[in-house]
Swiss-Prot record:
Strongly expressed in fast skeletal muscle, and weakly in heart. Not expressed in other tissues. It comes from Danio rerio. Signal peptide: none annotated. InterPro entries: BACK, BTB/POZ_dom, BTB_POZ_KLHL31, Kelch-typ_b-propeller, Kelch_1, SKP1/BTB/POZ_sf. This is Kelch-like protein 31. GO terms for cellular component: cytoplasm; nucleus. PANTHER family: KELCH-LIKE PROTEIN 31, LD33804P. Residues 173-274 form the BACK domain. Keywords: Kelch repeat, Repeat. Residues 74-138 form the BTB domain.
Length: 635
C-alpha cells in the first residue's frame, strides 16, 4: 500500500496577505535601503535642485502657433474691418490686458471687433503673442504701435520704442519725433530730439529740415542745450529756413529773437550778420543787431545788460583753479587757469594777464574776477609784494579786460559777491594788516570804500549767508583768532557773531544751502608750532550757532574751495604734518556729512583759488580757436 502523501498545511488568508504584502513591498524596501546610505554616517548629503528644459517654452509657443495656423482648438476671433484672425483666448489674454479684461467680463465671448486697427498691425501683434518675435520696419511700425497700445501690450510698446531710438539717424530723426509725438511715446521723443540737438548741423543740411514748422524750429532755437560750434551758425541756420519760403518772412523777428547775438563776436556781427538784408531792413531785426553791438561797445555795462541772448548755449559748469604756487616750480608763480571736464580730466582754459599767488577770485554774471594777491614769491615778506590788480575774464570769448585797480593793495584778504557788487575785505600789504573794506560797482568800473571792520584782520575767510558777509577767524593782533563778524551791505555796518570753536587762519569758507562752512587752515599747537585744523564747523544763521560736522581727511591751509552740485570741493594746500604741498581734492557731501577723496590736481599747489564758472562746450571753444576773428584779445 502506497504511503500517504502529506497534505500541505493550509495557509490562512492572513498568511497569504502577508506574503503578498512582502512581495509588493520589495522595491520599496530597496529604496529604503538606499535611503539609509544618505542617512548613515558613511552616506552623502543630497539637496533638491530645480532643472529647466530650455527648449520647452519655445516649443510650447511653436506648438501653439501651429495650432493657430491649423485653427485647432481656437476659441476666439479678433477682427479688423477687413480681416479676421482665429486665436486662442488663453494666449491672447496672457499678453493683452485689453483682451483679458474683456474675457473676465464675459468668458464666453467668441469675437472681438477691433475696427480701429489695421490688419498689418493686428497680425504683427498676434505673431508677437505666439512667438515673442516680430519684424519691425519704420514703414509699418506705426500700425504696430497703434495695435500694441490699444491691446495694452506694454512689452511690445517698449520693444517698438527701443527700436525707434536704436534706428534714429539724421535722415529719419524728424519722422521718429513725429511718430513718437503721435503715439505719446515721451521717452522716444525726448531721445530723438536729443539726437537732433546733438547733430543739428547735419540735420540742417537734410531736406527734412526745410519742412520743419515754425513751432518746431522755434523750439530748437530756444533750446539752451542745442549743440552748435557757434551762435553765428545758429543764425545762419535760421536764415536758411526763413529764405526757403517767402511766406516765412513774417516769422523773422520772433525766430531771430532766439539767436544769442550777444555771444557772437563784434567782427562776426559786422562780417556775417549785418550784411544780411533783413537785419538792416526789418526794424525789429535791426534792433537785435544794434543791441548786440551796444553790448560789445560797453564792456563795463555788460553785467546789467546780461540776458538770455548773452548767455552761451549749452554751457558747461566746471570747477576752476586759478594761479597759485606749484610744488615743482616752487620759486615761480603760476598764470594758469585750469578746468576739470566731464571726464574729471584737468585742462588748461587760459592764462591770467600776470602771475599771481594768494589772489582772490569771484564769479558774477558769468564773468570771472581776479583780484589782488602777490606778484612775487617771497615767503619772508609776502605783504611787501601785495598788489591791487583787478581783472575780468569772459569765458564766452576767452578774453580778459583790465578793470580799475582796488583802492588798496591786498593779499590774504577775502572777496565776495552780493547783489551785483563785489566786496574786498581786510587782508594785508606793506602797511600791515588791514581793516578796510571796499566795494566794486561793475556798471561804473569803480571801487568805493565801505565801513571798516572793528579790528584789522588778514588770513581770514568769508562767505555770504542770509544776505550778509560772514567773516571768520584769521590773524588778528599777531595771533590766530576765533572771532567772527558779519557785514550787512544794506546798512553798511558790522556786527560781532558767535566765535568759532577753534582758532584758525589761512582757511576757507563756503556756503551750501542755508549753512556756511569753515574748513581747513592752521593754528598754533601746544609748543607754539603751526598745526593743521582738521575739524570743520558749520554756521546756522537762524540760531547764530556753530556746530561740528565731519572733519577733514587731510589737513590743509592756503587751499582753494568751491561748491559744485551742492558739494564742497577743497583743493590743494599746505599740510603741516608732512611739511609739503598737496595735490589732493577732498569732497564734502552735506547730505551724508561725509568727506571723500577725489581725483588729484595735476600738480601739488598752494595759494590756489577756486570757483565754478560756465564755459562754452569744447566744440564751441575749438571753433573759436580756429577762427582769427575770435582769437583772445585784451582790452
Amino acid at each position: 500500500m502506497a504511503p500517504k502523501k502529506n497534505k500541505a498545511a493550509k495557509k490562512s488568508k492572513a498568511d497569504i496577505n502577508e506574503m503578498t504584502i512582502m512581495v509588493e513591498d520589495s522595491p520599496s524596501n530597496k529604496i529604503n535601503g538606499l535611503n539609509t546610505l544618505l542617512e548613515g554616517g558613511n552616506g552623502f548629503s543630497c539637496i533638491s535642485t530645480e532643472v529647466t528644459d530650455p527648449v520647452y517654452a519655445p516649443n510650447l509657443l511653436e506648438g501653439l502657433g501651429h495650432m493657430r495656423q491649423d485653427s485647432f482648438l481656437c476659441d476666439l476671433t479678433v477682427a479688423t474691418k477687413s480681416k479676421s484672425f482665429d486665436v486662442h483666448k488663453v494666449v491672447m489674454a496672457s499678453c493683452s490686458e485689453y483682451i483679458q479684461n474683456m474675457l473676465r467680463k464675459d468668458p464666453s465671448l467668441k469675437k472681438i471687433e477691433l475696427s480701429d486697427l489695421s490688419p498689418v498691425g493686428l497680425a504683427t501683434v498676434i505673431t508677437y503673442a505666439y512667438s515673442g518675435k516680430l519684424t519691425l520696419s519704420l514703414y509699418t511700425i506705426g500700425s504696430t504701435i497703434s495695435a500694441a497700445l490699444l491691446l495694452q501690450i506694454h512689452t511690445l510698446v517698449k520693444m517698438c520704442s527701443d527700436f525707434l531710438m536704436r534706428e534714429t539717424s539724421v535722415e529719419n530723426c524728424m519722422y521718429v519725433v513725429n511718430i513718437a509725438d503721435t503715439y505719446n511715446l515721451k521717452e522716444t521723443k525726448e531721445a530723438a530730439q536729443k539726437f537732433m540737438r546733438e547733430n543739428f548741423i547735419e540735420f540742417s543740411e537734410m531736406e527734412q529740415f526745410l519742412k520743419l514748422t515754425y513751432e518746431q524750429i522755434n523750439e530748437f532755437l530756444t533750446d539752451d542745450s542745442l549743440q552748435l560750434p557757434s551762435e553765428l551758425t545758429a543764425f545762419q541756420i535760421a536764415v536758411k529756413w526763413l529764405d526757403f519760403d517767402e511766406k516765412r518772412l513774417k516769422y523773422a523777428p520772433d525766430l531771430l529773437s532766439n539767436i544769442r547775438f550777444g555771444t557772437i563776436t563784434p567782427q562776426d556781427l559786422v562780417s556775417h550778420v549785418q550784411n544780411v538784408p533783413r537785419m538792416m531792413q526789418d526794424a525789429e531785426c535791426h534792433r537785435l543787431l544794434v543791441d548786440a553791438m551796444n553790448y560789445h561797445l560797453l564792456p563795463f555795462q555788460q553785467n546789467i545788460l546780461q540776458s538770455r541772448r548773452t548767455k552761451v548755449r549749452g554751457g558747461l559748469r566746471v570747477l576752476l583753479t586759478v594761479g597759485g604756487r606749484p610744488a615743482l616750480t616752487e620759486k615761480s608763480l603760476s598764470k594758469d587757469i585750469l578746468y576739470r571736464d566731464e571726464d574729471n580730466v584737468w585742462n588748461k582754459l587760459t592764462e591770467m594777464p600776470a602771475k599771481s599767488f594768494n589772489q582772490c577770485v569771484a564769479v558774477l554774471d558769468g564773468f570771472l574776477y581776479v583780484a589782488g594777491g602777490e606778484d612775487q614769491n617771497d615767503a619772508r615778506n609776502q605783504a611787501k609784494h601785495a598788489v591791487s590788480n583787478f581783472s575780468r575774464y569772459d569765458p564766452r570769448f576767452n578774453t580778459w579786460i583790465h578793470l580799475a585797480n582796488m583802492i588798496q593793495k591786498r593779499t590774504h584778504f577775502s572777496l565776495n559777491t552780493f547783489n551785483g557788487l563785489l566786496f574786498a575785505v581786510g587782508g594785508r600789504n606793506s602797511d600791515g594788516c588791514q581793516a578796510s573794506v571796499e566795494c566794486y560797482v561793475p556798471s561804473s568800473n569803480q571801487w568805493q570804500m565801505k565801513a571798516p571792520m572793528e579790528v584789522p584782520r588778514c588770513c581770514h575767510a568769508s562767505s555770504v549767508i542770509d544776505g550778509k558777509i560772514l567773516v571768520s577767524g584769521g590773524y588778528i593782533n599777531n595771533a590766530y583768532s576765533r572771532a567772527v563778524c558779519s557785514y550787512d551791505p544794506s546798512t553798511d555796518s558790522w556786527q560781532d557773531k558767535n566765535s568759532l570753536s577753534s582758532p584758525r587762519g589761512w582757511h576757507c569758507s563756503v556756503t551750501v544751502g542755508d549753512r556756511a562752512y569753515v574748513l581747513g587752515g592752521s593754528q598754533l599747537g601746544g609748543r607754539g608750532e603751526r598745526v593743521d585744523v582738521l575739524p570743520v564747523e558749520c554756521y546756522n544763521p537762524h540760531s547764530g550757532q556753530w556746530s561740528y560736522v565731519a572733519p577733514l581727511l587731510t589737513g590743509v591751509s592756503t587751499a582753494g574751495a568751491a561748491t559744485l552740485n551742492n558739494k564742497i570741493y577743497l583743493l590743494g594746500g599746505w599740510n603741516e604734518i608732512e611739511k609739503k604741498y598737496k595735490k589732493c581734492i577732498q569732497v564734502y557731501n552735506p547730505d551724508l556729512n561725509e568727506w571723500t577723496e577725489d581725483d588729484e590736481l595735476p600738480e601739488a599747489t598752494v595759494g590756489i583759488s577756486c570757483c565754478v564758472v560756465t564755459i562754452p562746450t569744447r566744440k564751441t571753444r575749438e571753433s573759436r580757436a580756429s577762427s582769427v576773428s575770435s582769437a583772445p584779445v585784451s582790452i
